[in-house]
Swiss-Prot record:
Belongs to the dCTP deaminase family. It comes from the Bacteria. Its EC number is 3.5.4.13. Pathway: Pyrimidine metabolism; dUMP biosynthesis; dUMP from dCTP (dUTP route): step 1/2. The keyword Nucleotide-binding applies. This is dCTP deaminase.
């Protein structure tokens, strides 16, 4: 399994639409950086958010998640309440090749402020906008800046294609648009 370089990421995005829209350089001036980097791609967070609220005093159940537990918000800056989280989506649409798996890690700029981004791996032949989970681990409100970097995606090629890809099994998050809540 090999880690993929900026050249590979750029070629796959330009020739095969792996990342759209694709930023072929790292944009850094006055923003939290995004775009291609040496061995990854810093994706951006879009303007649509679902901010968790516990006004219903409910139990969080991934098998029966109540959509009323979220407040929908659209804007350039999202305020995540203390010790809470928000769901968001990427600006970029991803199409993962059959022999590739990705891992995603949060940006250090946010992590150093107690803001953690979680994303599960993009499996072979998965495609869609990425649903991001953004946790504010601090006792204070935290700002998230739309259309700026939120997490870095690193791409790994397998030594051979999988027998069954995410696309083959018609995974439940295939082709997702918008912020997608848990599905069973």
């Amino acid at each position: 399994m090999g880690l993929c370089s900026d050249r590979w990421i750029t070629r796959m995005s330009r020739e095969h639409g792996m990342i759209e829209p694709f930023e072929d350089r790292q944009v850094r001036q006055g923003v939290i950086s995004y775009g291609v980097s040496s061995y990854g791609y810093d994706m951006r967070v879009a303007r649509e958010f679902k901010i968790f609220t516990n006004v219903l005093s409910s139990v969080v159940d991934p098998k029966a998640f109540d959509p009323k537990s979220f407040v929908e918000f659209e804007g350039d800056v999202c305020i995540v309440p203390p010790n809470s989280f928000a769901l968001a989506r990427s600006v970029e649409y991803f199409r993962i090749p059959r022999n590739v798996l990705t891992l995603t890690v949060g940006k250090s700029t946010y992590a150093r402020c107690g803001i953690i981004t979680n994303v599960t791996p993009f499996e072979p032949e998965w495609e869609g906008y990425v649903t991001l989970e953004i946790s504010n681990t601090t006792p204070l409100p935290a700002k998230i800046y739309a259309n700026e970097g939120i997490a870095q995606v690193v791409f790994f090629t397998g030594d051979e294609p999988p027998e069954v890809s995410y696309g083959d099994k018609k995974g439940k998050y295939q082709g997702q648009h918008g912020v997608t809540l848990p599905r069973i």
